[in-house]
């Protein structure tokens, strides 16, 4: 038990060992290479107090599954036509699924404990909760992007082959059994899914093992962003000086006197970066935004850097078309369900000196966020609330629910959307969404009662839906002082909430 505590208390970015090699170390290497194991039969005859069957996740249970999995591997290899033995194959896939889920849970323990302990030491847990809000990204963009010139819209690629993700973990995890077990899970996935082409293997694995894939994908993102942040900090104090972007896998090297000269091991050519003190980078899920006050040449160099980074360091090809460079204010980028832009707002001020008066024309860039109606209607159509033209449809699946449950579901969807899109500077699209959801709700109720929408609304009245479709500005009027904002002003202002920690499901459809 003291050894477990020692492994959990290890500090630093790299994790020397994880928990599960201590439990499975004598089995993983042999299992990965199909070598024989002397499994003791008494292993499967222990009482529940030891086996821990009453727990949701038991390390001993996973260890038994590995033993059984190896025994089935030996039996399957002895059968000429293994496709006919569907029962054994089904159990094998089930065992692999349980092992991969336990693998993902255990591998997250050191990182989660390290995060919680660091937050407790700094006593910034409340602030951290606020920073988790998606809307905090937009408040950052609103404050910074109005002073920038160029923006790069980047679709972050993901490795096509799962082996690339294992290689990334080699600089994090130093125990060999961990990598053997991970490769074993990937190998079984490929063997059991021959219908999936290699180009779609990563995507399929993300659907079958979402938790494990999320951990592997985050490790890939952390590594490439760590390299990017290092080069970004190095370029901030250099004067048009060239330096080879480092890419040694485990450590970053710098020479003395803050000269960022590094070993160029994985790049085929040297990239030239320029000084830029105003560069901002924001990422959420698989999309990132990089904005700068520099010139177009600088943005092209960073684009070339990203393409070469993915190609030479991570060994997979990324199309340059995944990175779009545009200039404000002639560009709008789509991010987290919002269509954002930095338009120039002209204004005039009257000035008077003695007896002479004159007008001063000024232009002020302002960060604006709007809701794009066409993708939003497409998302509602995908969820079967309307067709692609925006005409509301009934929800036959909900017709068997009670009237109050049906209205509550529609009302909750609208309130969540209105809450998420409170940062929009133009609320007309929200009124269109409200119209679609209200009429879809009315058609669902009319379908349930075998009546027409007109007759149903005449019998109950349009006020019947009002308490379920509460406007966001009415909620804001209860929160903010009425002397500061009127309802008309609130409809034109962007309001960001710090309690939104995930994207709305309908907004998620827009990124598919």
Swiss-Prot record:
Transmembrane segments: none annotated. Keywords: Chloroplast, mRNA processing, Plastid, RNA-binding, tRNA processing. GO terms for molecular function: RNA binding. GO terms for biological process: mRNA processing; RNA splicing; tRNA processing. It is found in: Plastid, Chloroplast. Pfam families: Intron_maturas2 (PF01348), MatK_N (PF01824). The keyword Ligase does not apply. The keyword Chloroplast applies. InterPro entries: Domain_X, Maturase_MatK, Maturase_MatK_N. GO terms for cellular component: chloroplast. Its main location: plastid. Belongs to the intron maturase 2 family. MatK subfamily. PANTHER family: MATURASE K (PTHR34811:SF1). Usually encoded in the trnK tRNA gene intron. Probably assists in splicing its own and other chloroplast group II introns. This is Maturase K. The gene is matK.
């Amino acid at each position: 038990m003291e050894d477990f505590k020692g492994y959990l208390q290890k500090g630093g970015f790299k994790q020397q060992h994880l928990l599960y090699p201590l439990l499975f170390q004598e089995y993983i290497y042999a299992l990965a290479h199909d070598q024989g194991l002397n499994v003791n039969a008494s292993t499967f005859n222990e009482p529940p107090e030891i086996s821990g069957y009453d727990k949701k996740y038991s390390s001993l249970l996973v260890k038994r599954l590995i033993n059984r999995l190896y025994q089935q591997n030996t039996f399957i290899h002895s059968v000429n036509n293994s496709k006919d033995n569907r029962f054994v194959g089904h159990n094998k896939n089930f065992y692999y699924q349980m092992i991969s889920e336990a693998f993902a849970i255990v591998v997250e323990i050191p990182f989660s404990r390290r995060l919680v302990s660091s937050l407790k030491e700094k006593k910034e847990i409340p602030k951290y909760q606020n920073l988790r809000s998606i809307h905090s990204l937009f408040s950052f963009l609103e404050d910074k992007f109005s002073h920038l010139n160029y923006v790069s819209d980047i679709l972050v690629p993901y490795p096509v082959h799962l082996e690339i993700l294992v290689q990334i973990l080699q600089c994090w995890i130093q125990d060999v059994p961990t990598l053997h077990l991970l490769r074993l899970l990937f190998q079984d996935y490929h063997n059991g899914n021959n219908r999936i082409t290699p180009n779609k293997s990563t995507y399929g694995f993300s659907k079958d093992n979402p938790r494990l894939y999320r951990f592997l994908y985050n490790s890939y993102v952390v590594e490439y962003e760590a390299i990017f942040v290092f080069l970004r900090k190095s370029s901030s104090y250099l004067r048009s000086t060239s330096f080879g972007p480092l890419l040694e896998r485990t450590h970053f090297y710098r020479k003395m006197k803050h000269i960022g000269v590094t070993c160029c091991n994985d790049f085929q050519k040297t990239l030239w970066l320029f000084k830029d003190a105003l560069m901002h980078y924001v990422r959420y899920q698989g999309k990132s935004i990089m904005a700068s006050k520099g010139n177009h040449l600088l943005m092209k160099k960073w684009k070339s850097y990203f393409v070469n980074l993915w190609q030479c360091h991570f060994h997979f090809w990324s199309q340059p078309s995944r990175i779009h460079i545009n200039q404000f204010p002639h560009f709008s980028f789509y991010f987290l369900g919002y269509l954002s832009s930095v338009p120039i707002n002209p204004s005039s001020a009257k000035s008077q000196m003695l007896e002479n008066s004159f007008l001063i024309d000024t232009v002020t860039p302002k960060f604006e966020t709007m809701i794009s109606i066409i993708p939003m209607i497409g998302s509602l159509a995908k969820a079967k609330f309307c067709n692609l033209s925006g005409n509301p449809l009934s929800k036959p699946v909900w017709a068997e629910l009670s009237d109050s449950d049906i209205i509550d579901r529609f009302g909750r969807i609208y309130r969540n959307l209105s809450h998420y899109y409170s940062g929009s500077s133009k609320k007309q699209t929200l009124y269109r969404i409200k119209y679609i959801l209200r009429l879809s709700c009315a058609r669902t109720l009319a379908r349930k009662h075998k009546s027409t929408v007109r007759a149903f609304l005449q019998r109950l009245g349009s006020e019947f839906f009002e308490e379920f479709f509460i406007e966001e500005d009415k909620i804001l009027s209860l929160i903010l002082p009425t002397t500061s904002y009127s309802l008309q002003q609130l409809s034109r202002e962007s309001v960001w909430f710090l309690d939104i920690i995930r994207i709305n499901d309908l907004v998620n459809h827009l990124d598919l």
